[in-house]
Swiss-Prot record:
This is S-adenosylmethionine:tRNA ribosyltransferase-isomerase. GO terms for cellular component: cytoplasm. It catalyses: 7-aminomethyl-7-carbaguanosine(34) in tRNA + S-adenosyl-L-methionine = epoxyqueuosine(34) in tRNA + adenine + L-methionine + 2 H(+). SUPFAM superfamilies: QueA-like. It comes from Shouchella clausii (strain KSM-K16). It is found in: Cytoplasm. Pathway: tRNA modification; tRNA-queuosine biosynthesis.
Amino acid sequence: MDVNEFDFDLPEELIAQTPLKTRTNSRLLVVDKKTKAISDRMFPDLIEALSPGDCLVLNDTKVMPARLLGEKVETKAVIELLLLKQLEGDCWETLVKPAKRVKIGTEVSFGDGKLTAICTAVQPQGGRIFEFRYSGVFYELLEELGTMPLPPYIKERLEDADRYQTVYAKQIGSAAAPTAGLHFSEQLLLEIEAKGVKIVYITLHVGLGTFRPVSASSVEDHQMHAEYYQVTEEAAHTLASARENGGNIIAVGTTSARTLETIYSDHGAFVAASGWTSIFIYPGYKYQAIDGLLTNFHLPKSTLVMLVSALIGKEALMDAYAHAIKERYRFFSFGDAMFIRP
């Protein structure tokens, strides 16, 4: 399958650079999975599309302030580290700027020595493994010394870092936000629960690979990045109960969808599980775990566009995106939302 089949022209001014003042003021494009009918709504109208007994699945990961600015201990040259993935102990996979200045044994200091890191390995694709040394709690130092990494297409400074977190963010470990969840307020979640919809929290720590363009010309040749996920016994029980009683499983975001599909693919049922997933969903894939999907509008030729296409069909997806562009919906992380209704 040619990657170019998932390309489309997006006016640059439709790429949202800042979040709306009120989370729930986003627009919502509703697409019926069966009929492909499209309707323009506002985000709080999501409640009307949900039924008692449905299960709304949210990713409670929390974005790390993963960008660190430090200096080489030996030369005082400025070095930027971007934490990608925690390995064993205090070792992290990172991206470094400028990479050419960092070799095995290079020591970098942050915050006048509050945090130091030594390069222990150079990866084939250019990344670096660093082992961190510190006193105290690592994530507290990260909160103090780090800054929030924003997607490369966002050029404006984020005034309030909390706006790149969901209101229910809890499990720290992501390099990027699960952006479909940014539209929810605490009040809206209470109203959804009051309707009889079950809310389930699962965890998938989002890696920066989510922004990596597909470099292969054929979809099937793309190598998907791996991300850590966890689903608890309580979450699995609620999901299984909803399915057994005829409720729809609605994934909030592609991260929730990938987590649930991983578990169903591996176990054939909703069970408690944790591990690393590199599941790649594109047209031809048969969804087993989810019935509906709430998601943002994604980049052309991205794996996320492919994932959504697998749920409603490529033609229906492209029709919906053409409508969204015509109606001036806001795209990408701080943009509007799309609900694929079961």
